[in-house]
Amino acid sequence: MPFADTSLRDEYAAAVEQVAGRTLDALRDGGGPAALTARDTIAPRPLLAAVRVLGADLFAPQLLTGAEPDGPTSELLVEARHTLPPPAAGSEEAALVIGWQDWAADRVLARTPFGAAVSPAAPPRTPPAPSPGPETAGWQAWSVRMAQLSVLALPGLDGPVHEDARTHTLGLARGATRAMLRNDLTTAVRLARWLAWARADGRPVRLEIEPVLERIRLVGAGSARMRLELAVAHGLLNADPR
C-alpha cells in the first residue's frame, strides 16, 4: 500500500519537525525542558518515533546550559526506545551510525533515574565498534559519517568518536567546505556543529565557523531540525572552552 506508506512517512516527518521545533523553543527560552506531551496522556506513535529520531538532541537545552536532563523527556525517550527498537540496518555502515546514536542517548539517560529502564536485564551499554577514521575511510566518507553522528556533539558526551573529532579537525573543515560547495546544507551544518564542539573543547579548527553558520541561516531550507542544529552549534560556540 504505497499511498498509506507515504502518508505514514509524512506523518512521522511532521512529528520530527514538531519535536525539533519545541526543543528549539526550549533552547531559545534558556534551557528548560521542551513541552513534548501533556502529563498523564498516552504518547501517539508518531511522537514516539520523532523522540526516537531526535535522541540525545532532546536534551540539548539542558546540556548546553549545564543543567541535568529532565525527567518527563527522559521517560518519554525510554518509552520510545521500548516501543520502537532500533531499525534493521541495511549495511554495516548504517548499523554503526545507529549504534553510536543510541549510545549517545544511553549516556544521557544514564544521568537520570530512567537510565536502567532502557534495557533493565542487560549490562551497561558499551560503545559500538570504533568508527574508522579518515586515514582508513578517506576524509570525504569519514566527514559524511561524522555529519550523521552530529547528535554526539553535545556537552557531557565523550568517547572514541569525539577523539576522532579532536584529532581530525582538518577533515571536518574539508567536509564542511565540500558540503557548502555542493549546497548540501544539512551535512554542512552538522559538520560545523562538530567544529564548534572541537573549538569549545579547546582545539584549533581550520575554518571560520560563524560565517558558515550565517550562510546556512540565510539560504537554508528553514526546517526546524536544521534550525536546531544551527542553534546547538551557536550554543557550543558560546560555551566556555573546556
Residue ranges, per PLM feature:
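Polar/charged low-complexity regulatory segments
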Residues: 1-178, 182, 186-201, 205-242
